[in-house]
Structure formats: structure tokens, C-alpha cells
Amino acid sequence: MSPLNDLKINLNGQYTFFLNQNVISKYSGSLRKMIKQSKKKRNKKKRIITIEINDFPGGPDGFELVSRFCYHNGEILIDVSNVSTLYCCSVFLGMSEKFCFSNLFLQTEKFLEEVFYGSWSDIVSCLKNCEQVFFQADSYGLVDKLIFAALNKISQNSDDFSSSSLSSFASSLSPEMAKNTSESDGRYISRSVACGRSNEWWFEDMTNLSPKIILKLVMIIGAYKTNIKSLVLTRFLLHYLKTKLQTKSRTTTELMRNKLEYSDLADTAVRGVISAGTRTFSCRKLFWILRVLSSFSLSRESRIGLETLIGEMLEQATLDDLLISARGSRESGFYNVDLVIRLLKVFVKNREEEEEESRERNMKEIGKLIDKYLREISPDQNLKVPKFLGVAESLPDSARDCFDGVYRAIDIYLQSHPNLTPQDRTEICRCLNYKKLTMETCKQLARNPKIPPEIAIEALKSRCGNQEHTTSDVKVANKSFSCRYSEEKKKPVVLHLEITEKLAERLKTKGGYNLKVMDSFREGL
């Protein structure tokens, strides 16, 4: 160790620097004071003075920059990639003109003044450098000043990005900053507009910034968790969160570290979407927004607000829209069935106030969609019977002219879940309206070995009893079945069914009607 290195600095409890007291204290008032105090307390036999410094801006990299400045006689190359760090270090260590002419604080302050009046790219680069020293940069007001400068550039070149808050903070800037638009900015923005980006020319650059800085921007313009009126800001937040989600595999640690900030940004984006409403966002776009924002721990209030917006226009949805993967454990199912049930409840409740003709048309549309959805989710091994019924029974009976689609979904479910109990097989058929089954489907149901016998009989009884008859005996088009219907209601109804031998063995006398097996056509089923 060189005899000149008589100062030991332990930085943030992890790093150690050996420096010369005279060199370092020449520029730093804080270090000069700490050295003086340490000399009073130290053992006279110890030549090296030890100083502990915690929470230093930029950590060891920041302190190395300061040391380089001191050892190069107060000179260092300052650029947009390090000026924010150097500025915070100079404030932290008290490197003002009081101790040295043209000290680090003055040099960084002059450079930043040029940045405030300079190009868009320089402002963004300085904001990026603030991420390394965010706590200090925010405390010293540097983040606010850079965001003001950035927003000033955006407001000058984005017609739709205007609000009273922009006017208020713009007035706090100097006249030079408020009216300045550099030639380089003009060329950059012109290229963006030519590419069709218009008011979104700044999106990609700002997306590279940390959520802490974006959240600070949102707070400055008064849009934090409020019903923001700026559609451009809403679109930016959606773009920002989508981009961060796409890089999640590479930045999982960063996302977890900033979980609270991302959640706040997502909630703010939802407020903007709700303010814009369905006139701005299509049903498909709203589903996309829900997929993206649900990954950032939305608050319950935001989730309900977004789901309500989607539910009110659910008749415009497609099957792909509804097939949203469940989050977390797959034990509850591959698809987010609970979400669809909630959306259906909103839809049905919202349609109660519609005119009858419009309500009936929309109900029929959503009925067809949900039947497709049921068939799609039925093979899921983790889909429980109550969840299946929750979807099927979310719509009123009037939403379906025919229940064939529901039966097909039940058939798929039974084939995919061979270990269901007899009680579950009976329970899942609860959602069927037998009178709205076609005769062909009714016959398929009766042949289906997965369907409990009592369900098959009840379906056939309801279907035959629902026919209009002109004679006492009715022959169904397919000769597999024949029905004799007695109009004397006081007497038992005799229902003759041609069914499989296996089913015949399981049939018993039920209620007020007798079941009689016909042997003539067993082989045909």
C-alpha cells in the first residue's frame, strides 16, 4: 500500500477504497468534516483513518467516478450517461464552490442546464442514468426537472397530449426551456410522424425507463389512479406494460422488485381505459388489455371496473377472446372459467334494462358463443362439474332456442372424465332443457352409456310429451323409438322405448309411468 493512501473508506458495508486524505478532502466538504471527526476519535498509533459511508449514490461505481475526478485535479468527462450519478454524488459529498473553484457540483449543474434545453434523446438518457441513483435523484429534485423537460418536449409535439397539469408545470420552467425545441428534435419527430407514429413518437424511448420514473411522470401530471382524460397517456401506459411483460422472462427479478410500481401503473391505465369507454376500445381490445394488465396485480376495484366494461359488450366477443388461461396452479383448470362466469353475470344484468327485441337478439348471440366455449373447455381434466354448470347456467333459458350444443359439451365432458361418480353424471345434466333438444340429439342421449338411465328416460319423456299429436299413436321418423301418449291425464302414461339390453337391465319402475322394454329393435342401437 502506498504511504499516501492514509484514508480507508468502507462503502455501503461491502466495498473498501484506500485514498489520500488531502486529495479527496480538497473537493468534498462532507469528507473533510468526517476526516476531522475521525481524527479526534482515532488511536494516535493508527496512521490510517477509517470512515464508514452508507447509501452512497451509485454505489462503488459512483464513488469511483468521484475519486477519478479528485485525482485528475477536478476534471472528468461528463456526458448524459453519467451526469445524473455525478450530480447526486456531488450533492451527497458537498462538492461545492465553497471548497474548490469549478467543483463537481457546478460542472454537473451546468451540463444539466444544457440538457434541459437540449435534445429529446439527451433528456431520456439522463433519466435513464437516474435509475442508478433514483432515491437521491428524486430527493434532490433532478428527476422532476428532467421529467418536466421531457413533458415539455412531448406537449410541444403531440397535439392530443395536453392537460391543465401540463400547463401548470410548463409555467414553472424558464422561458428558454418552455419555448425551446432543438433542430435535432424536429428532425427526430418528423421521422416519427412519417412512420405513422404521430403522437406516439415518444413511446419506445420512454418504455426503456424504469417503472419508478414512469410512475413519477404519471404523478407529476396529476394522472395517478385518477380518471385520466389523456387517451395518449393511457395508450402509452398500455404499451409500456405490454413491452415489460414481453421481456418478463429476462427481467423477472426486476418485475418482482418493482411489483408495487407496476401495479400502480396498471391501475392507472385501467382508469384511463374506463374513462375512454367502449367508444374507444373494442371488445377484443378490452380482452387484450385484461390479459396484459392482469399480470401486474390489479387492484380489486380496477379488475371489477375493467370486467364490467367488457361484460357490457360481451355479445361482441369471440371464442378466442374467452379462452384466457388461468393464472397460478393448473389444479383449478387450464382456462379462467371464473372470469367468464363473472362476465356473464355482468352481461345478463346489463341486458335487463334493454328493449325486449334487442335483449333477445343479444342473448341468442351470447348463447351460441357460450355453447362453443363449453365444448372447448370440456376436455380440461381439472374442470370440475360445478364450474361447468356455473358457465352453462349463467344464461337464462331464453338465451337458447336449442340445447343440442349444451348436450354436445356434456358428452365431451363425460368422455374426457371417465371416473365421474353417478351423482356427478346426473348433476351435470341439470343444465339441459330436454324440451329444447332435437329428436336426433334426444336419441343420441338415450344411446349414450355415460348418461344415467333416469336422465335418458326423463329426456325422452319430455321430448315425446312436447310433440303435438293428432293420433293416439305416434311413430318417430327413426323407427328406433315409438311413443304411445295417453291424453287421459288421470291414468299412468305408458311409454314404450326400444333401447339397449344393457340399459334395459338397469331400468326400474319410476313415478307415475311404467317402463316396458321392447325386444324387437335392441340390435339396432
Swiss-Prot record:
Gene Ontology CC: one annotated term: Cul3-RING ubiquitin ligase complex
Domains: entry comment: The BTB/POZ domain mediates the interaction with some component of ubiquitin ligase complexes.
Domain NPH3: 200-466
Keywords: Ubl conjugation pathway
PANTHER family found in the cross-reference section: OS12G0117600 PROTEIN
Pfam families: NPH3
Domain named BTB: residues: 5-79
Role of this protein: May act as a substrate-specific adapter of an E3 ubiquitin-protein ligase complex (CUL3-RBX1-BTB) which mediates the ubiquitination and subsequent proteasomal degradation of target proteins.
GO BP field: protein ubiquitination; response to abscisic acid
Source species, domain of life: Eukaryota
Pathway: Protein modification; protein ubiquitination
Identification of the protein by name: BTB/POZ domain-containing protein At1g50280
Record family assignment: Belongs to the NPH3 family.
Keyword Phosphoprotein attached: no
